[in-house]
Curated annotation (Swiss-Prot):
Pfam families: PP2C. Binds 2 magnesium or manganese ions per subunit. Keywords: Hydrolase, Magnesium, Manganese, Metal-binding, Protein phosphatase. The keyword Manganese applies. It catalyses: O-phospho-L-seryl-[protein] + H2O = L-seryl-[protein] + phosphate; O-phospho-L-threonyl-[protein] + H2O = L-threonyl-[protein] + phosphate. This is Probable protein phosphatase 2C 49. It comes from Oryza sativa subsp. japonica. PANTHER family: PROTEIN PHOSPHATASE (PTHR47992). Gene3D superfamilies: PPM-type phosphatase domain (3.60.40.10). The keyword Manganese applies. One of its GO terms (molecular function) is metal ion binding.
Length: 416
């Protein structure tokens, strides 16, 4: 089913002249964008490093191109049973591709059990997609620091309370975490006098690091609820009983409430290749972008959703996917992949693994690398990895002009 969708969209998008040499060259370049660094993360030990799938994102200025994408997946849930137990462990898959961009400016962060030692109310898992613009610096900073700042805010929220009974206001926790992330990005931008090697900041004269920013959509998945915080136009969608439930709303400058907020702050929305803040930025909220403050704010919108028996999956993705794929279609692709791989395994059983090529460029660099940390094996949960990859391919087939990063989290209960 999912493969048929991709083939149909590819057929629609390719003109009759695609048989020519130019079209063949384009397809070859597109295929090059699907190199992977992959792995599976075991449940963390006391000092185990959390998993990260890493990349970079946006703009059309030529720059160095290194690795191209990342795919990683979580292992089988070690224990679940009839209830969402405190040791519940999600499966997940990640795909990031260049698409039609010269550079990768997306970044993805996967941090299993990231509140370890801070709560006794069950394991909580952090998933984040960061879509950079101007360069990948801020997206990479969010990738490395956002989960740590959320942990700090969480600890302060439960300070002086019994950890098991503490029910922190997640809205406040996320807002403080995002605010500190924005402060760090602003301080970094002011301290820079030029770009890093092999990044586009150095191509600007003078180098303007305060022109760099990133969207941020973050999900904290726990045994009983899913918390989503969003700033920008990346998106989180929950699939529940086959019906897509948006857990975030894109921050576009022409969204009525955002337009009023920008005007109240003294800014303007100019329609130049779409609605843009001051005719520049195509989103109304982001981390960084110091030169557009206070019109562009980092304050996230936060939703807290109680988990249900018929939850199937959570999809986080950059606008490279959502610009061309509807919520309904994305959910159907994931459900088709889940059906083809069978029901979730019972506790203690291994899922089928999809073995992928070794990393294509695993060293850090100036914004175009794909790095997976804390991974020992080149393998991925098949259902989640298939779903994430198919969604990325579908976006490319539908002529997405951006980097595409997709995270698929399996929320289904295991079959006893």
């Amino acid at each position: 089913m999912a493969a048929e969708i991709c083939r149909e969209e590819a057929a629609k998008s390719m003109p009759a002249a695609a048989a020519g040499a130019t079209a063949i060259a384009r397809r070859r370049r597109r295929v090059e964008g699907f190199r992977f660094a992959a792995g599976s993360l075991e449940p963390p030990q006391e000092d185990a490093d959390a998993g990260v799938a890493r990349c970079g994102k946006r703009q059309r200025v030529a720059g160095a191109r290194a690795g191209a994408g990342a795919a990683t997946a979580g292992p089988c849930r070690p224990s679940a049973g009839a209830e969402f137990g405190s040791r519940w462990w999600p499966r997940y898959g990640v795909t990031s591709v260049f698409g039609r961009r010269r550079e990768m400016e997306d970044a993805v962060s996967i941090r299993p059990d990231f509140l370890r030692g801070s709560t006794s109310s069950g394991k909580h898992h952090f998933f984040g997609v960061f879509d950079g613009h101007g360069c990948s610096h801020v997206a990479r900073m969010c990738q490395d620091r956002m989960h740590e700042l959320v942990v700090d805010a969480y600890k302060k929220a439960v300070s002086g309370k019994e950890a098991a009974a503490a029910a922190p206001a997640w809205k406040d926790v996320m807002e403080k975490g995002f605010a500190r992330m924005d402060d760090e990005a602003t301080i970094w931008a002011k301290s820079r006098t030029g770009g890093e090697p092999a990044c586009r900041c150095e191509l600007q004269t003078p180098a303007r690091c305060d022109h760099v920013g990133s969207t941020a959509v973050v999900a904290v998945v726990g045994p009983n609820r899913v918390v989503v915080a969003n700033s920008g136009d990346s998106r989180a969608v929950l699939c529940r009983a086959g019906v897509p439930v948006p857990l975030s709303v894109d921050h576009k400058p022409d969204r009525p409430d955002e337009l009023e907020r920008i005007k109240a702050a003294g800014g303007r929305v100019i329609y130049w290749d779409g609605a843009r803040v001051l005719g520049v930025l195509a989103m109304s909220r982001a981390i960084g972008d110091g030169y557009l403050k206070p019109y562009v704010t980092s304050e996230p919108e936060v939703t807290v959703t109680e988990r249900a028996d018929d939850d199937e999956c959570l999809i986080l993705a950059s606008d490279g996917l959502w610009d061309v794929v509807t919520n309904e279609m994305a959910c159907e692709v994931v459900r088709a992949c889940f059906r083809s791989n069978g029901p979730p395994s019972p506790p203690g059983c291994s899922r089928p693994k999809a073995v992928l090529p070794p990393p294509a460029g695993a060293s850090g660099g100036g914004g175009g690398d794909a790095v997976v940390k804390g991974v020992d094996k080149a393998e991925s949960d098949k259902a989640c990895a298939d779903a994430a990859l198919l969604l990325a391919k579908l976006a490319i087939a539908r002529r997405s002009a951006d980097n595409v990063s997709v995270v698929v989290v399996d929320l289904r209960r295991p079959v006893p």
